[in-house]
């Protein structure tokens, strides 16, 4: 008879003692995720302790943390970027994991309950305006009911969109064909992310959708390569199970499934910092899979992507010059650059070593859109325990109730429009794991099999996972932010609907 050994872990974190017993099967399950009992015990301690609120001091606004580019600025930075395209490796990084379930939530409600809602009615009244109409009608019976139409959109009786990721959904209708969100990224990448004639695009994809992405790419890449006169280098990766976090009961004890197993959950987009860390590039553009528009409306996107990248190149160039010739420069000159250009405000007594350390970080230039009621995090000034103020993208869940007035005064929001420099002054890749603030995770209430649980997300990719980067915010027009969060967004003018 096999002996059932127990691994007992004592996690001691900021005065919190958590004794956790893991059985041999538990330990084997933990290791199968690429985790260790110590890591899981630390996660359990984090549930007990919670995560502190961000110490926001004020919102970033134009003139105080957000730069507004003039036409001469845009021209100058664009010229810098075009020059960099000749010598730099450029990658477009597109988070594209997960099914589009939320995009079709109201349609699922109608399908499951028969209760019509405004979204469903609008979809049914405008079916022929969607890019997927020609594909959809091939599945419809001769005299389809409303339920037939919705079922053929969502289920494998038709398009099966309810089980597909957004990247594989037809977003835009052109004169003789339609394009998926993935195809729009191919087109977009060819227009600003080329380097020596090649477009490098990396998609993060769920394992169950890899085959679908590969099939679509095999059909479309040759077409777009010929259309734009470029070569494509497309790579894909999965969110690693080693970034999963354990789920707990409401009393913070490990949640177990009906068969007694521990439950691990994907830890949110912050886990993708490991995928980003694997990217070998000088310049990385980051943009979500659903934030695309049509060829005719893409002008502002191309214009500002180039300008933001050129600004990044200029900031890197100066930071590298200071690092490589640190003693040759006056410390006040370096401090002024750090304060005015890198937007890091250090205490007056900050040492030369502190200034050098600040220069030696990854840099990101982030577009910020004026508030129009869209969801998403916002740009804020945040003060750390050493008194240093820097710019951060902060989610509402990170803001204390008594700081809501500061949050409500925010003028801009985060559209996830990042241009990143991940090499150091010697051309070596930074280890991005060194620049995460582990105390910026999220805990939320979820359910599994009808039972309540608590889930933990790692620090968000553009939030705590980049907390110790140098961050610069630039105002960009709302025309660069055209996501499809719900299916009826595809009927908006920004998606080419007429």
Locations of the language-model features?
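N-terminal regions that are enriched for targeting/export leaders
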Residues: 20-62, 76
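Short, Lys/Arg-enriched N-terminal segments with co-localized hydrophobic residues
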Residues: 3-18
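Domain-scale recognition of functional cores that engage charged ligands
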Residues: 30-31, 56-372, 381-401, 458, ...
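Primarily single-stranded nucleic-acid-binding OB-fold modules
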Residues: 342-364, 373-382, 388-394, 403-498
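Short linear interaction motif-like sites in intrinsically disordered regions of transcription factors
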Residues: 2-3, 134
């Amino acid at each position: 008879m096999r002996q059932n050994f127990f691994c007992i872990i004592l996690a001691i974190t900021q005065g919190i003692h958590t004794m956790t017993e893991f059985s041999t099967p538990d330990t084997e399950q933990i290791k199968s995720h690429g985790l260790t009992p110590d890591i899981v015990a630390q996660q359990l301690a984090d549930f007990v302790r919670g995560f502190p609120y961000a110490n926001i001091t004020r919102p970033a606004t134009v003139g105080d943390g957000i730069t507004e580019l003039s036409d001469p600025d845009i021209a100058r930075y664009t010229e810098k970027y075009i020059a960099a395209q000749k010598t730099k490796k450029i990658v477009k990084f597109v988070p594209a994991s997960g099914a589009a379930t939320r995009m079709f939530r109201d349609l699922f409600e109608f399908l499951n309950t028969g209760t019509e809602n405004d979204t469903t009615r609008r979809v049914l009244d405008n079916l022929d305006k969607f890019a997927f109409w020609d594909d959809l009608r091939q599945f419809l019976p001769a005299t389809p009911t409303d339920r037939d139409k919705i079922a053929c959109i969502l289920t494998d009786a038709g398009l099966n969109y309810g089980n597909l990721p957004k990247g594989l959904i037809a977003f835009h209708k052109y004169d003789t064909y339609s394009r998926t969100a993935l195809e729009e990224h191919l087109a977009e990448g060819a227009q600003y992310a080329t380097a020596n004639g090649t477009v490098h695009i990396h998609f993060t994809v769920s394992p169950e959708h890899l085959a679908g992405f590969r099939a679509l790419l095999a059909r479309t890449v040759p077409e777009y390569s010929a259309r734009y006169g470029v070569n494509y280098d497309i790579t894909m990766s999965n969110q690693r199970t080693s970034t999963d976090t354990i789920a707990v009961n409401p009393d913070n004890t490990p949640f177990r499934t009906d068969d007694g197993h521990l439950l691990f959950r994907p830890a949110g987009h912050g886990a993708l910092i490991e995928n980003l860390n694997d990217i070998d590039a000088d310049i990385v553009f980051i943009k979500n899979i659903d934030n695309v528009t049509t060829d005719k409306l893409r002008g502002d996107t191309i214009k500002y992507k180039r300008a933001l990248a050129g600004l990044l190149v200029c900031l890197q160039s100066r930071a590298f010059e200071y690092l490589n010739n640190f003693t040759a420069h006056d410390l006040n000159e370096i401090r002024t650059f750090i304060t005015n250009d890198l937007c890091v405000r250090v205490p007056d007594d900050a040492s030369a070593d502190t200034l050098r350390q600040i220069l030696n970080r990854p840099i990101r230039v982030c577009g910020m859109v004026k508030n129009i009621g869209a969801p998403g995090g916002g740009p804020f000034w945040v003060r750390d325990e050493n008194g240093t103020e820097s710019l951060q993208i902060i989610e509402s869940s990170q803001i204390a109730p008594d700081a809501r007035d500061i949050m409500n005064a925010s003028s801009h929001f985060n559209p996830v429009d990042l241009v990143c420099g991940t090499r150091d002054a010697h051309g070596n890749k930074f280890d991005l794991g060194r620049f995460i603030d582990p105390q910026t995770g999220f805990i939320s209430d979820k359910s599994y099999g009808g039972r309540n649980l608590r889930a933990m997300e790692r620090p968000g990719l553009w939030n705590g996972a980049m907390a110790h980067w140098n961050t610069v915010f630039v105002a960009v027009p709302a025309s660069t932010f055209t996501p499809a969060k719900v299916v009826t967004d595809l009927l908006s003018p920004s998606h080419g609907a007429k």
